[in-house]
């Protein structure tokens, strides 16, 4: 466990690699039992993302959070402490959406199949996913949680939360060349200094206790609005993928397998 703590410390000290919840506050410990912290190893080095438990054996995150190996920490509040509630699970299989495009960041969604099932507890449990009959509307108030930096110069190792409102699609279409209202959500009032940013990527946008979006990208300076992947548009793919990859828990390997479906 000690090497992992050292790696987490390294990640949190990297300004460009660590994520930001801007304008938020510290969350009540373990009030977001679906939250996952992802420690990612890639040829470029170490990075961190958010994610969220959607079934005992699957975490949902952003497709751009892929690496050669991923460790998932569930049940955490302070990611630099060895909390009794924490469950550290390696990823067996990373399944990017087959139409993910890193050039325009479209279809930025990925399922992570865990090497073993998470144990449900008061600090670890899945979040609900959206139904087709209920759609987000501009003005809806939602919550984003994540670890990382809270400003350009100040970091944190405890889970942060911020409330953000859904915006009109046109606002993001005016700011981001490749914004697609069919598969993305525009979130965050530009008149407020509140946003999710960068390493918070992969974390959930939760509205009325349902995960509706995934932190995807925003402006370089973190000013809102930001773009979130619209989970509802990908529900057929999510359900099909989780059915296809039946749980097969194996001993840890040095690298994870990658699949598309």
Curated annotation (Swiss-Prot):
Glycosites: 71
Active site: 64 (charge relay system), 108 (charge relay system), 201 (charge relay system)
Subcellular location(s) per record: Cell membrane; Cytoplasmic granule; Secreted; Cytoplasm, Cytosol
PANTHER family with a match to the protein in the record: CATHEPSIN G, KALLIKREIN-RELATED
Tissue-level expression: In adult, detected only in bone marrow where expression is restricted to a small population of early myeloid cells.
GO cellular component, one term: membrane
Classification via InterPro entries: Peptidase_S1_PA, Peptidase_S1_PA_chymotrypsin, Peptidase_S1A, Trypsin_dom, TRYPSIN_HIS, TRYPSIN_SER
Maturation-removed propeptide residues: 19-20
EC number, UniProt record: 3.4.21.20
Regions crossing the membrane: none
Disulfide bonds: 49-65, 142-207, 172-186
Protein name: Cathepsin G
Top-rank EC class of the record's enzyme: hydrolase
Signal peptide extent: 1-18
The organism of origin for this protein: Mus musculus (Mouse)
């Amino acid at each position: 466990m000690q090497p992992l703590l050292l790696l987490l410390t390294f990640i949190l000290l990297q300004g460009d690699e660590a994520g930001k919840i801007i304008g938020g506050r510290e969350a009540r410990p373990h009030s977001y039992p679906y939250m996952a912290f992802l420690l990612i190893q890639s040829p470029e080095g170490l990075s961190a993302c958010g994610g969220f438990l959607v079934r005992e054996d699957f975490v949902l995150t952003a497709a751009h959070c892929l690496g050669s190996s991923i460790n998932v920490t569930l049940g955490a509040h302070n990611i630099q402490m060895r909390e009794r509630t924490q469950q550290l699970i390696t990823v067996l299989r990373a399944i990017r959406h087959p139409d993910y495009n890193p050039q325009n960041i479209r279809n930025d969604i990925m399922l992570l199949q865990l090497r073993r099932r998470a144990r449900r507890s008061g600090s670890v449990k899945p979040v609900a996913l959206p139904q087709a009959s209920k759609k987000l509307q501009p003005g809806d108030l939602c919550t984003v949680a994540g670890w990382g930096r809270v400003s350009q110069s100040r970091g944190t190792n405890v889970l942060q939360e911020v409330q953000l409102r859904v915006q009109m699609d046109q606002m993001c279409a005016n700011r981001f060349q490749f914004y697609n209202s069919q598969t993305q959500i525009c979130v965050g009032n530009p008149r407020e200094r509140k946003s999710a940013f960068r390493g918070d990527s992969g974390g959930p946008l939760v509205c009325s206790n349902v995960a509706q979006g995934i932190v995807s990208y925003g402006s370089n300076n973190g000013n809102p609005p930001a773009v979130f992947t619209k989970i509802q548009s990908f529900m057929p793919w999510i359900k099909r993928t989780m059915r296809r990859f039946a749980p097969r828990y194996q001993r840890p390997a040095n690298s994870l397998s990658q699949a598309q479906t």
